[in-house]
C-alpha cells in the first residue's frame, strides 16, 4: 500500500474520506470543495486511491502543498467499501464525512451539519442533494431529506446519501462498511440508527451528485437486487424483505416522477 503526502498538521476534528478510482477528470473539483468549507473546524482529507491507472495520483499531487490532504494508494483494486474502511482506520478526526471523487459539496455543508449535531446530539447527520449531469451542470432535480430519520423509516428505503453524511467516528468504526455486493452504506446507516437513534437531516442540497450512466444507483435492477440482499444480510426473512421491497419500489417511482424538477432524464 503506497502512501504519500502524509504531513503533520493540527489534529483534525473532521476527517473527510474520499475513495477514488479512475477519478483524474473530476477529483480536483471534489478536493477544492473540501478546501472551501466554512465550518471553522480543523479537518483532514484522506484520498484512498483504489489502484487507478488514469492519472488520479498526478491529479491529487497538485494539492500536495496543503498539509491537510493525505493520499493513500491501494496496491490492488478492492472496491469502494474497502477503500472507505481503510479511510476510517486511518482517520484522526472525531467526526467522519464521505465524498466520492466525482461529487462535490457546497461551502457551508460541514458548518451546517456541525451546528445541527451540536444542537441535537445526533450521531449521524445528512443533507439533501442536487443531481448533476456528467459535465457538472444541474439536471434541475433536488432530492430533500426529512429532518428526523428513524430506523423504521430508513428500512423502507435509503434516504441518506453517503456523500452527504457527517457522523461520529466511533460509531463508524464500531460497524464499518460491508462488501460491495450489498448497499454497504445503507447497511451501516441502519446499524447506527438501530443502536444510537434517529439521524438528523438538513434539508439543503449541499451535496452535488454527478450522475453517470454506469453508476450503481442508476442500474435499477442491480440496485433492487442489492437492496433485497441488504435486508437479508441484516437478518430479515424473505417475506419481511419483500414487504420492505414494496416500499423501496414505491419510493423509487416517487423519485423518478415526483422529485423537484420532474421526471429523471
Protein language model annotation of sequence segments:
Residues 108-139:
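Conserved donor NDP-sugar-binding/catalytic core segment of glycosyltransferases
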Residues 74-91, 112:
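Glycine-rich, basic loop-to-helix element that forms the pyrophosphate-binding segment
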Residues 1-33:
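N-proximal low-complexity "stem/linker" segments adjacent to membrane-targeting elements
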Residues 96:
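Short aromatic/hydrophobic "clamp" motif used to bind/position activated sugar donors
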Residues 32-42:
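Short, acidic, metal-binding catalytic loop of nucleotide-sugar glycosyltransferases
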Residues 144-223, 230:
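Conserved nucleotide-sugar donor-binding catalytic segment
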Residues 25-28, 54-62, 104, 108:
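Acidic helix N-cap motif at the loop->helix transition within catalytic regions
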Residues 33, 49-58, 76, 100:
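A conserved acidic beta->alpha catalytic loop
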Amino acid at each position: 500500500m503506497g502512501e504519500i503526502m502524509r504531513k503533520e498538521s493540527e489534529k483534525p476534528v473532521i476527517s473527510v474520506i474520499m475513495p477514488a478510482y479512475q477519478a483524474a477528470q473530476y477529483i480536483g473539483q471534489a478536493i477544492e470543495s473540501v478546501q472551501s468549507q466554512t465550518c471553522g473546524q480543523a479537518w483532514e482529507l484522506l484520498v484512498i486511491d483504489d489502484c487507478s491507472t488514469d492519472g488520479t495520483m498526478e491529479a491529487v499531487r497538485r494539492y500536495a502543498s496543503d498539509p491537510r490532504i493525505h493520499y493513500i494508494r491501494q496496491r490492488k483494486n478492492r472496491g469502494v467499501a474497502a477503500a472507505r474502511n481503510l479511510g476510517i482506520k486511518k482517520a484522526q478526526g472525531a467526526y467522519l464525512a464521505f465524498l466520492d471523487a466525482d461529487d462535490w459539496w457546497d461551502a457551508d455543508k460541514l458548518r451546517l451539519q456541525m451546528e445541527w449535531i451540536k444542537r441535537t446530539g445526533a450521531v449521524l447527520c445528512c443533507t439533501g442533494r442536487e443531481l448533476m449531469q456528467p459535465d457538472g451542470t444541474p439536471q434541475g432535480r433536488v432530492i430533500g431529506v426529512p429532518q428526523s430519520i428513524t430506523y423504521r423509516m430508513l428500512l423502507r428505503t435509503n434516504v441518506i446519501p453517503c456523500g452527504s453524511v457527517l457522523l461520529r467516528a466511533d460509531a463508524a468504526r464500531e460497524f464499518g462498511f460491508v462488501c460491495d455486493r450489498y448497499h454497504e452504506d445503507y447497511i451501516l446507516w441502519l446499524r447506527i440508527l438501530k443502536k444510537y437513534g434517529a439521524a438528523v437531516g438538513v434539508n439543503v442540497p449541499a451535496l452535488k451528485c454527478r450522475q453517470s450512466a454506469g453508476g450503481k444507483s442508476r442500474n435499477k435492477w442491480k440496485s433492487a437486487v442489492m437492496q433485497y440482499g441488504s435486508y437479508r444480510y441484516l437478518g430479515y426473512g424473505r417475506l419481511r424483505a419483500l414487504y420492505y421491497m414494496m416500499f423501496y419500489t414505491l419510493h423509487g417511482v416517487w423519485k423518478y416522477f415526483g422529485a423537484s424538477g420532474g421526471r429523471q432524464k
